[in-house]
Regions:
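Acidic phosphotransfer microenvironment of two-component signaling modules
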Residues: 30, 109-110
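A short, charged, amphipathic alpha-helix used as a generic interaction element across diverse proteins
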Residues: 111-119
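Actinobacteria-biased recognition of intrinsically disordered, low-complexity terminal regions
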Residues: 1-4, 42, 118-120
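STAS-typified acidic loop motif
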Residues: 2-37, 53
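Short acidic-hydrophobic, aromatic-tinged amphipathic segments that line or gate anion-handling sites
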Residues: 101-109
Length: 120
């Protein structure tokens, strides 16, 4: 993984959580996308991408999240984000409409609760 970003994963039942730390841009977005997709299985009903420790997200990163959400929707899976507020990432999420394309939560427990309460 690029020195710009680090991705750590953990599992909560059948829900993978990917914590992205650092900067996401065109130089590392393919690698990050491949890692995110590798976390999904046919058993997964959802995935959470935690951007709380992400310091930069360019248009390539935004596009990755939109694309991943669409891919998951076609498989009857849901993508949710965790975004610290206030943060530069929260502003980018609002400006680009990511918050209308997928659920965005302030904390991981909030995101997990939402996905478990509404598995559809």
């Amino acid at each position: 993984m690029s020195t710009l970003a680090r991705l750590e994963d953990e599992w909560h039942d059948e829900i993978p959580v990917a914590r992205v730390q650092g900067e996401v841009d065109a130089s590392n977005v393919k690698e990050i996308g491949d890692r995110l997709r590798s976390l999904l299985s046919n058993r997964s009903v959802a995935m959470i991408v935690d951007l709380s420790a992400t310091t930069y997200l360019d248009s390539a990163g935004i596009n990755l999240l939109f694309t991943l959400a669409e891919e998951m929707r076609s498989r009857q899976q849901r993508l949710a984000l965790v975004v610290a507020d206030p943060s530069p990432i929260a502003r980018m999420v609002a400006l680009t409409g990511l918050d209308r394309a997928m659920p965005v939560h302030r904390t991981l427990p909030e995101a997990l609760g939402d996905l478990r309460d509404d598995p559809a």
